[in-house]
Amino acid sequence: WEATKKSPISTSDLAWRVERVRLPLAATLQRDTLEKTLADTTANDRDRLNASTKLALLNRTDAGHQFELTRLRLGSVNVLHMPGELFVEYQLAAQQMKPDATVCMAAYGDYAPGYIGTEIAYTQGGYEVQASSSNTAPAVEKVLMDAMRRLLTD
């Protein structure tokens, strides 16, 4: 704490910005299959819970829900608030978008999307981008990167 560099800030150093986006959902989110799983009283509780959360995401999306991405600026420090569990590439890209400032990222703002991979990660496979872990489509990377760029532009 004692080694922390402290800087005074004024109201002109503070900013709050919001970008709303629709996240492209995974093709594996099939309403009829999820509804059957949820209605199946012989299915295990974990599968039924998973189906219910995925159905809730589908319902929110169908109703026009947009996810809020936000930026808090405190002087030269920027904090992005993001949905889901993001791959580290999003943090690295955010820092490159604003190389002369500190950029921090706080994810898990809304966990409905689950893991959010990069476009290429969905073709490479792995736990984080499989149907049980991620509810987003590969196109999500462009949506989020574009929104991050808009947020970080002064």
Q: In which residue ranges do the predicted regions lie?
A:
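Non-catalytic substrate/cofactor recognition surfaces at enzyme active-site rims
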Residues: 1-154
